[in-house]
Amino acid sequence: TSFEDNKAPVTEDGKIDYSKDFFGKETNLTVSGQLEAETYAMALGKVYTFGPTFRAENSNTTRHLAEFWMIEPEVAFMDLDGNMDLAEDFIKSVLSYVLEHCKEDLAFLDQRFTQEEKTKPQLQRSDMSLLEKLKFVADNNFKRVSYTEAIDILRNSKPNKKKKFQFPINEWGADLQSEHERYLVEKHFKCPVILFDYPANIKAFYMRLNEDGKTVRAMDVLFPGIGEMVGGAQREERYDVLVEKMKAMNIDEKELWWYLDLRKFG
């Protein structure tokens, strides 16, 4: 559901009125096949899923879709460094192929992108054309920066000090928005960025807890003009730690008994 907590409209018998929700009715759609893919990775080592994914976010921007197709690799015994290497290599490989083999399509899209940019206020326009963005990502090494370092950079940035950010960065633990991610990529580092080691309380239960007890081995790949493009994480392989995280997030262990068994017998 896209309703806010405790604000969902209800019917006369007290049930949620899904006719007023995002999809207009009660709907169960796939968010991710990641947990299930882990079971296959335990047997095969390297697997991936590719298929439709759905979000119930009522976000009307050019960066959010109710439905999109997503690829999700799962690799047994891979740490976060390997995860980041895989994401960077995959992105560069795809973009290099597209730039070489889809020139006419890209020229059409680049022209359309340029026309759309002209309709925006000057401060909101991209500094690069579509083709320049793709080449920018394909040709540059990705900068790897911890979440903590990124927060320090953003907190001391001119847009933050001059209150230009819609969501000011005041303290560690903030969930970064697109404006923050784009600043890091386009203004500060001027190259694609991979942020890693996020606060545990803003990430999923299955991400491996670091020794500091407050961050997890998660990463996001950030693109110019967009922000987050890829997300990933090293999985929590320690059974006792995983159970404690599930309890802290009020996740029913009985519903995910099969997932926990991967830590017992995987």
Feature names for model-found ranges:
Residues 1-18, 22, 89-223, 248-256, ...:
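Metal-assisted phosphate- and nucleotidyl-transfer catalytic regions
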Residues 1-76:
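Class II aminoacyl-tRNA synthetase-like tRNA-binding/catalytic domains
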Residues 72-83, 225-228:
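A generic structural motif
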Residues 42-44, 79-100:
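His/Asp/Glu-rich mid-to-C-terminal helical/loop segments that flank catalytic regions of hydrolases
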Residues 83-87, 146, 238:
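Hydrophobic (often cysteine-bearing) scaffold residues that line and stabilize catalytic clefts
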Residues 29, 73, 150, 195, ...:
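A residue-level signal for conserved active-site and pocket-lining positions in enzyme catalytic cores
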Residues 35-38, 55-60, 78-79, 201-205, ...:
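Flexible loop/turn segments at secondary-structure boundaries
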Residues 234-238, 242-245, 263-266:
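Cytochrome P450 heme-iron axial ligand motif
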